[in-house]
Swiss-Prot record:
The chain crosses the membrane at residues 22-42, 47-67, 79-99, 104-124. Changing H98E: No change in activity. This is Mercuric transport protein MerC. It is a multi-pass membrane protein. Hg(2+) binds at C23, C26. Residues 1-21, 68-78, 125-144 are cytoplasmic. InterPro entries: Mercury-R_MerC (IPR004891). Keywords: Cell inner membrane, Cell membrane, Membrane, Mercuric resistance, Mercury, Metal-binding, Transmembrane, Transmembrane helix, Transport. The keyword Metal-binding applies. Inhibited by the thiol-modifying reagent N-ethylmaleimide (NEM). Involved in mercuric ion uptake. It comes from Acidithiobacillus ferrooxidans. Its main location: membrane. Monomer.
Length: 144
């Protein structure tokens, strides 16, 4: 994964998590953590964060993960990196558009945040390396 893609991925993840810190009505556990670290002033922009910023940052993280696949060609890493942003998007849209129960939407959103955070830590500890050439993978000769 290139340095630009990794930076954009981290920006998307941090933006989604910090955005959830401002939403006391939607995500009380994240908002209480945000208030504890001094981000309580963000609550005045709760509507902006829930309607726009969280979906934008989660989409940025998802697109950066999908773009990273073109450089490392590891479908397992791409799949794990995509689960978190997709869950966060389903949770936030389920809450704002009322197609999910409020408690279920929160659980899905929090699960997405945790998965995004854990995959981000994993990516920092064990960065992706290219497994295949861009034109395809060579298969080993069969053993006789």
């Amino acid at each position: 994964m290139s340095a630009i893609t990794r930076i954009i991925d981290k920006i998307g993840i941090v933006g989604t998590i910090v955005g959830s810190f401002s939403c006391a009505m939607c995500f009380p556990a994240a908002a209480s953590l945000g208030a504890a670290i001094g981000l309580g002033f963000l609550s005045q922009w709760e509507g902006l964060f829930v309607q726009w910023l969280i979906p934008i940052f989660a989409s940025v993280a998802l697109l950066a993960t999908l773009a990273g696949w073109f450089s490392h060609r590891q479908w397992q890493r791409t799949l794990l990196g995509s689960i978190g942003p997709v869950l966060a998007l389903v949770g936030v849209f389920g809450l704002t558009h009322h197609f999910l129960d409020k408690d279920l939407a929160r659980v899905i959103f929090y699960t997405g945040l945790v998965v995004m955070f854990l995959v981000s830590i994993w990516d920092m500890v064990n960065p992706a390396n290219r497994r295949c050439a861009t034109d395809g993978c060579e298969t080993p000769a069969p053993r006789s």
